[in-house]
Amino acid sequence: MPEPCARDKLLIVDDEAAIVRLFKIILSSSLPGTVVDTAQNGKEAVEAFERNRHATLLMDLHMPVMDGRQAFQKIKEICKENDWVMPSVIFCTGYAPPEWVNAAMAANPAHRMLNKPVSSSTLIETVRGRM
């Protein structure tokens, strides 16, 4: 049976520092007891996930170094190789979701899509429902 992720850990991944700060403030205050980590790109997200096994990732799609799709695929590979449960991934973008996001959500109902700008209440409700 696959080993579960750390249910009390959340990873926010976005290359826009202001969004990361805002999301961290909102979610830290709304989800007491949750460890909220951050990453600025997909490469940092993969490294943070390998170290901390976050149960939920809130991830932008368009980032430098490694984009959301590449990070998602790498995390999926890591989970398969290590027999870990795949974390819930909440994709977050200001653009129309690409087909691969729709396919990922169809394959795993724990994954979700949020369109930027997103209200605080929707953000909190969506993340809380995945933790």
Across the structure, where does each feature detected by a protein language model lie?
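Receiver (REC) domain active-site loop signature in two-component systems and cognate sites
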Residues: 63-66
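Non-catalytic signal-transmission and effector/linker regions of two-component phosphorelay proteins
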Residues: 1-11, 17-18, 24, 82-83, ...
